[in-house]
Amino acid sequence: MYNTILKDTLSKGLFTAHQKVLIAVSGGIDSINLLQFLYQYQKELSISIGIAHINHGQRKESEKEEEYIRQWGQIHDVPVFISYFQGIFSEDRARNHRYNFFSKVMREEGYTALVTAHHADDQAETVFMRILRGSRLRYLSGIKQVSAFANGQLIRPFLPYKKELLPNIFHFEDASNASSDYLRNRIRNVYFPALERENNQLKDSLITLSEETECLFTALTDLTRSIEVTNCYDFLRQTHSVQEFLLQDYISKFPDLQVSKEQFRVILKLIRTKANIDYTIKSGYFLHKDYESFHITKIHPKTDSFKVEKRLELHNIQIFSQYLFSYGKFISQADITIPIYDTSPIILRRRKEGDRIFLGNHTKKIRRLFIDEKITLKEREEAVIGEQNKELIFVIVAGRTYLRKPSEHDIMKGKLYIENLEKR
């Protein structure tokens, strides 16, 4: 069997880009077979190997497994890296601990591939589990044989092969695999045996479904590659079906953002119907859309400097945002010059709810001004407001300057010189 797997591995070039590979070894039959396979064919694959093992401390066999793996590494001159799980045990916490440890070892020890012993039975179980949970079609493609991980790749050379084909070599049995406390165990030990009485090719059918799903979504990705997804013009001129695919594909780029079908529909509707929107999604993510584009972004708390107001006295200089303001003192590098009709201090700040500016015949809300001038939400956040005697005297936004209209009785008392520091 190993010869067949070797030929398949070589034909696919799974390890062509790697010299040092880290093997995840639990002590079960799958991972011990993987260890034996990669150790036996190191020369043919042009690799050197290391072993990563987690002692979860949940079973009395854990110490024996660790000791066996340590001794195996010493006998075969293979480095072994051990980590110990601590805290309250759960499947999710244990999995996170494992993969964080694998990533750490790879980065610190120079391994460029993590290799795990997932096989075809695992693939069938994963697809079935996702069907039970109501996952979207794209996720029925299941486990990928090669995927990006840490500073390299995660490779699963056994994935096309059923567990029953692996040699029955020495290994440790995990008694928890018989427990019905875990969904995957119930699928393996209860649901599959019952359903296979109706269709004895059930696992093969699920694997075929995963392969066809993968093929379908690869084709859709290829066919839509030229579309700039976050460009509103490009996105909105597609059919609704293509829009759904594009948005699903875009959201999938954020692994820690899991949106429900209802949340997805809300996001899609906002993109289709709103010109400007900032919408909080979940898990620290929000949707930002303006007239030209939309983006999903991780929310970062606003800094104090964003909220601060600065007081500018006559004959003084202040820096606020990207601008240098000189009140009454000429500067040759000024990009903007504003006439000032009072010598009282000028407050430099960001916009506030209810801000208005006098434009001559009428007073206009800043919010309405931004809408009329098609100022994007990002540009609105960066707008600089100049206030004097509790009255707005200027707004700088999107490279434009809007000034309060002076009355016919106003007398100019000085000038405000403004330099855009980003132009230096």
From Swiss-Prot:
It is an enzyme of class 6 (ligase). It is found in: Cytoplasm. It catalyses: cytidine(34) in tRNA(Ile2) + L-lysine + ATP = lysidine(34) in tRNA(Ile2) + AMP + diphosphate + H(+). Keywords: ATP-binding, Cytoplasm, Ligase, Nucleotide-binding, tRNA processing. The N-terminal region contains the highly conserved SGGXDS motif, predicted to be a P-loop motif involved in ATP binding. It comes from the Bacteria. Pfam families: ATP_bind_3 (PF01171). Ligates lysine onto the cytidine present at position 34 of the AUA codon-specific tRNA(Ile) that contains the anticodon CAU, in an ATP-dependent manner. Cytidine is converted to lysidine, thus changing the amino acid specificity of the tRNA from methionine to isoleucine. GO terms for cellular component: cytoplasm. This is tRNA(Ile)-lysidine synthase. Belongs to the tRNA(Ile)-lysidine synthase family. HAMAP family: tRNA_Ile_lys_synt. One of its GO terms (molecular function) is ATP binding. One of its GO terms (biological process) is tRNA modification. Disulfide bonds: none annotated. ATP binds at residues 26-31. Its EC number is 6.3.4.19.
